[in-house]
Amino acid sequence: MLCCLVFKGLLSMDLLRFLLISPFALIKGLYRLSAYLLRLVGRLLRPVVGNLNWRAPQWMTKTANGLHCAFNRSEQWVAKHPKGISAAIVLLMAAASAAFYGYHWYLNRPQPIEPAPMVYQETSIRVSAPRTVNYQAQKPEAQPLSLNFMHSAAPITAMGQVVDQGISLTPAIEGEWKWATERTLVFTPKKAWPMGANYQITIDTEKLLAPQIKLNQTELNFTTPAFAYQLEKAEYYQDPQEAQKRSTIFHVQFNAPVDVASFEKQILLGLVEGKSKSEKKLNFSVVYDEKKLNAWIHSQPLMPMDKGGSVHLSINKGVNASVAATPTTQAQNKWVSVPNLYSLAVNSINATLVESDNNNGERALIIAISDAVKDKEIKNAVKAWLLPQHNFQAKESAKTSTDFYPWDMDDIDDNLLQQSTPLALTLNEAEQEYQPIFSFKFDAPSYRTLLIEVNNSLTSVGGYKMPEKIYQIVRVPDYPKTLRFMSQGSLLSMQGDKQISVAARNMTGMKLDIKRVIPSQLQHIVSFKSSEYSSAHFNRLSDEYFTEHFQYQTALNNDNPGEINYQGVDLSRYLANNPSARRGVFLLTLSAWDPEKRDNQQHSEEDYDEDQEWVGDSRFVVITDLGIITKQSQDRSRDVFVQSIHSGLPAADAKVSVVAKNGVVLLSQITDSKGHVHFPALDAFKNERQPVMFLVEKEGDVSFLPTRATYDRNLDFSRFDIDGEETPSDPRTLSSYLFSDRGVYRPGDRFNIGLITRTANWATALDGVPLRAEIRDPRDTLMSTLPITLDSSGFNELSYTTGENSPTGEWNVYLYLVGKNNETSMLLGHTTVNVKEFEPDRLKVQLQLTPERQQGWVKPQELQANINVQNLFGTPAQERRVTSRLILRPMYPSFAPFPDYLFYENRHNSDGFETELEEQTTDLQGMATIPLDLKSYADATYQLQLLSEAFEAGGGRSVAATARVLVSPYDSLVGVKADGDLSYINRDAVRKLNIIAVDPSLNKIALPDLSLSLIEQKYISVLTKQDSGVYKYQSRLKEQLVSEQPLQISPTGTDFTLVTQQPGDFILVVKDSQGQVLNRISYTVAGNANLTRSLDRNTELKLKLNQAEYLQGEEIEIAINAPYAGSGLITIEKDKVYSWQWFHSDTTSSVQRIRIPPAMEGNGYINVQFVRDVNSDEIFMSPLSYGVMPFKISTKARQAAIELASPSVIKPGEVLPIKVTTDSPQRVVVFAVDEGILQVARYRLKDPLDYFFRKRELSVQSAQILDLILPEFSKLMALTSAPGGDAGEGLDLHLNPFKRKQDKPVAYWSGITEVNGETTFNYPIPDYFNGKIRVMAISATPDRIGKVQTSTTVRDNFILTPNVPAMVAPGDEFDVTVGVSNNLQGLKGKAVDITVRLTPPPQLEVVGEAQHSLSLAEKRETLVSFRLRARSALGDAPLVFDASYGSQSSRRTVSTSVRPAMPFRTQSVMGRMEGNKHTVTNLRQMFDNYAQRQATASHSPLVLTQGLARYLADYPYYSSEQIVSRSIPLIMQSKHPEMDSALNQNEVRDQLKNMLRILSSRQNSTGAIGLWHASPTPDPFVTPYVVQFLLEAKSAGYSLPNDILEGANNALRLLAARPYDDLYSLRLRAFAVYLLTLQGEITTNTLASVQSTLQQLYPDSWQTDLSAIYLASSYRLLKMDDEANKLLQPTWKQLGKAYSKAWWTQNYFDPLVQDATRLYLITRHFPEKVSSIPPQALENMVLALRDEHYTTYSSAMSILALESYTSQVAAQQDTPETLQIIEISKSKGIDPNVISTLNGLFVQGDFTGEAKAIQFNNYASAPAWYVVNQSGYDLQPPKDAISNGLEISRSYTDEQGKPVTQVTLGQKVNVHLKIRANAKQGQNNLAIVDLLPGGFEVVQQTAPEPEFYDNQDDQDEETGSGWQSPLMVSGSSWYPDYSDIREDRVIIYGSASTDVKEFIYQIKSTNTGRFVVPPAYGEAMYDRNVQALSVGKGHILVVPPEAK
């Protein structure tokens, strides 16, 4: 046995030795093999390279021997010690394995998730070098250097600031670096840059740029612009006055003032003659401009040269500037050619056509010469020959009368000249004796050829000659051809001459193709003809199917083809002879006709010549005497009116038919004596019976009007006031009027809404009608739904109480009519109320400008401004500070009563002015005069606006008023109105002006002794001195007087006819006797006349009613001013035609009357259509003029009789009796409100009747054919010699919990009460109120509504009006003023001693005296001031003011808020204890108020939920996800008493009920729930999360409404089946399937669908996604355990791993959500695996919670997961000593204090503010978790800014943009909030909280009213469209989603970007003092890691006005 063991040992030893030596043997084998291979290669190469004898160097031999020996010794040593070597190898392998495992563990250790990692931006810089200084300016300024960064690079606090570190210039230069924008850094030097210098910029990135910016280069170079010049224009100059003076001029332009000496030193000027190569030196002189920036080099005078030449300018390098610069480095050259003696040439010869004064064309020959020649010489030098028409030598050329041979210069010889005819040329008069262009008149046949000779005898003004004669061929152009119908229109009167007028030019004949329409086929005209009535074009069907064809041909006189030929064609011959069917409907086509050609030849030529432009016209014409007007009512019925075109009278007994497409007569009626018939709606007729026209027939006469609106026959009323609401088509239609009791409310107030409902006809019973009211906040979140049932009166009310944390802004109240089964609803009415922080006004301000002119103007010396300031308690506001701002905006006068008149002002200055006027103080009557001092401004017309503010006594709050007036220095103004367009008037057209004069009150006045000058504007050549010192002719616009005549303007105005006989640009100038220009009218006369007599003058019908409002049945008088005499139709219309009246007027002005129907209510429209009389000469205007004028019908018949009475004056604390008296049973609501509140709200008590009878639109559509009437041919021809012209949710965290207690608003609402006779309502007046109360009442009966108001003044013996800041911060020192008013009676003017005392609260201390004595007479007031300092105690601080005199006393208590200058923050520190002791240090130092300091520990991880629950409870936002997450801890209380919050179970149920109500309001029709409100496309995550919560709440024992869960389940089914395939959507689909399965639904198919999609699209990643565990849980619920366990495995493996890197998405899911959801689902559905859950799973969650990386959703999921885990794992029951919490004090000598020991599951205790650290002791073996919660306000602001993912900066400037640290009391300050995201998470869903300094209030940007009126009934409220922040002022670049305005802070919601966004708003100082500036705070609502906090910058000082 022993031998065997020894043998085995030896064997194993040998094996071990063999294994160890094997590597050595392997190495030796490889060495020998490589040696053998090398020898083999040598043998193979020996035959090629021969024998090589090489000996290794000595060092190599020694090295090889050494390595060989070492190798052998190693081999022997290993063979000797096999065991030691083996052990060492094993140890090395173990160490390597350990190192590898450690490295892997290090990589996969739990790593903290980086909060909002900063995104670094690699940016580049573009250097914008300074530009050259503009030395042309009066004060040249140094140009800045700009660095433009690609990204937003400036530190957010440095924008707009001067930079003093981080950047430098080399060489150094004095100046200033400043961030102009976030991307632009600008350097502005003190002096101009040296020109041409090189600079280097060095940048220190850390000091200069934002931390997220990285630069790719830190050194930049640039060069300043070098001194340089340019050789500009060079010319050969000839003196226009002395032609023999010639020289060359070179223009040199410099970019800086040139040094004259150095410049002239470098100039060389030489002359080269002909082709010579040598230069002759020329003398020169130089002319400079004033600034030495331009130089002109003049050569010596030059003589004419036979061969010409050139002048050469050379400027050498070395030219210097007179400023710091380097000299030029390059020479420059320029040449100017000198012409030779024989260089005169003819540039062009052309023949053209011009219009003569008599509309006829003339031919002209235009000759252009290269230099000016004398007119007499050119007259003799030019000759012309008319060459023959045919070339008889060319046999092949055609020789007919229409053929013209194309002669050219090669054909010209003596023989041809002998056959040619000399042509007479007449030289047109020349403007100057010498000129280069001339024109000659000539007369020659068209298309012929001229030969023009220009003799070489010409000598130019410069002495140059032509070398030889010039000959040129010129073609004679033909006159343009014209053939058109005259005038516009289609109707010829059957009783007129029936001639259609034609205008022709250059035509030998015309052909009129006449197609007469068969009457029975008229419907085809309407169906197939173009929709333009006058058009003869057919779209589809040929007109041959329904017409009879005729032709008319006639020759035209074309002896003078340039003249216009007028022709009339009598159409009466083509009428049928049958008097009962005249057939007067024609399609006319006008075309050219040649009398010399046969018809068939003309047809063939026309067909062949397709490219020739067609000359002709076409027209659709109806010969009829029947004019038609139709009016379509809102119910689609029609009223048809028929009128005689000839007489203008209504056509009685005419048959009116409605004709269908197929020609069938659908309806037919006979007109009555007023020419009227009525048809019902025609919509019932369809298809072939569709109506197409109204056909009117009478005694063989036929007319028609299409029924389609697509025709051009509808009248356009858009220029008239016809807008309004649509009249309901159903008389039973309901509408409601909603009104509030005061319009503005503080958060927490209750608002009352009255609702009055009526039907459209006021006749339908309202009893029992169900309505629904909805109240929505400014974010459109539904806050309440109230059912309402109407009674017979239709008068109801509702109330709603807002919360202290309700969002501020405009709330909306909607009233709906509920449909069947509540499925549909119709909006009946709507109103808005404003919820905001406000203080009631105490003053009433009236600003008056005298003399008062609502229209017109006031002369500056007459204008006075007075302000009246009264206390609202009825006494004058004495010694009140008044500030005023005067704004003058220049404007040309224009006045509403004269809208079409142009007034003129000879203005020389168009600058506006804005200035602060001197402050004033009111006198004993509360009055003050404001000096305007308008004398210092230029005489011009201005719009003056005066904005005045009256301040409260000693305070900064004010009440503003504005007034406006037009200011002009003139006694009268002259206005001019044209009857047509003045910019283009045809020659010889008639254009008239109406000239009026008005005084400042806009009364028309007479203005005698005026003159009217006609001036023509022409461009003429004027000899002008140039900058170079020489003279030249230049074209200048010159005004030349044409004529002048006296003018007298009458009181009614004067008409004047413009001169239009000559074309050109003219000005008509009206002057007074002193030559002052009163008006200038420019007009242009075109060269062509109105050949076709088209309509070119406006037709305007002016209507004026005698009243604005009428009683029912009253007669209306209409003053009608028409452009011509004629006949018309007046109708009263609205939704239908109510009545009508025909009239005739022989003059242009008349007064007509029509009566309103007795049953008509609301409003109506007077509609007048007026037709020109057939004998009128105004044929160049439209024959139809029309106008519409609205009128109002009195609501007196609907007014209920109600009276209201209240005492005029009472005292505070008394009861206000309000007596209401009615004449019948009425439902009445009485409400009384502080006038100061109503003044803030600008509340107007409107009359509900004005709403129900509001203006309705004109919905009647009018169509007609009367504007198509053609003038008679005889009338047209009679006027051709003088053709006419024309006329022409609670945000608790961001609210102030230390809010001061404010006095309740003085407002009373009685509720709706039945009153029949007399009833008294009593309202107890609060004892703190002094002021004016407006008392109002609204009453209603089924058929009447009443409105009445009065007022009562409340006034005590002593009235104290303290001015206290809304809030202050500890350390603030400020002044409080008290206005004291003595209202004691019977003092007889004697002053009495009154003691005023201030009792401060504990939070404040008085600095100085707390009591003052003053002497005050009756009805006088004065001011008392106290200085206070805020202590560190926080909260509401009531100040008590007492005033006493003898037995009389008065007390007033007003509170301020002492609140920290820091925002409220919650911080939770949590984690798992390492070992049995853990200490938490760095505790926050907080104010004790509202501070919560709590420490908790437990052996169960459920303790971590304590911190999460606190975080959720304090969370300030209310999206659907957030309110659901906040409710998760509440529903856990019933299961775990340790999680008790401050709410009991009843309060929890109430809170859950409110939350479910909000969720229900956000649920859409499919059941899906929106994030903020119901949306058709909601966030898909929200609905499944809400369902998960509902199921948890249900399992916790809370009852739920079934409808919300059922609806949400329906949305889940849609979500589960949604075909989206991205991973996020698939995760949500799996979530939805899980929730449906959890409720018992069989979801196998849907599960399989989701799983297969995941497997197909995401095979590598889906199994570890949350979608996998949702599917696994679903399969487990369906008892499919195998599939469930299979899907669980990949997720289970993930539980033990930590994340190697952080990740975040915006879709709610983060690493903590992943861990919590996995733990939650495994513990819920796989309980058997709970005991084996790896500790790393909990560790990952603890890590995220410890580092505060959680959101609302991840917090809620963590609570659910830990609760489920704790329920599955029984907690270890330990003794109390096993777990302790100890407080370690920061005070020395105090021993650590045990504040709590284990009690049940948790150990929990509160620690004090004296704690330095909290220590947790765990004496048990089980692990423990701890939580430390700290919530409150920090004592000190941070020293450094915080910018985690977001940057924020806040600065204060004055209104001019200058930074401020000291402001004047009442001054407005601009607050600039800048934000920028420096991480992706910091870009969305941000909340910015900006705390105001004490003593300031927010200014909301609402313009003050022009004036405050006592009688406010008719004042309309302005309504805006769309939400915009009421804070934002101009200059802001950030447009937030919403802003919440609180008393002490502004909260702004929106998004940021990586660029700086700026929001600017205003605050206003209200109290003097020294106030702490709080920091601005920002955070992301959905990512608590993203936070930003600016540094609070010291204090801001507010001083009295006189101390500034």
UniProtKB/Swiss-Prot annotation:
Pfam families, A to Z: A2M, A2M_BRD, bMG10, bMG3, bMG5, bMG6, MG2
CDD domains tied to this protein: A2M_like (cd02891)
Residues of the signal peptide: 1-27
Domain of life: Bacteria
UniProt GO molecular function: endopeptidase inhibitor activity
Family annotation (SMART domains): A2M, A2M_N_2
Keywords: Signal
Similarity remark: Belongs to the protease inhibitor I39 (alpha-2-macroglobulin) family. Bacterial alpha-2-macroglobulin subfamily.
Protein name per the record: Alpha-2-macroglobulin homolog
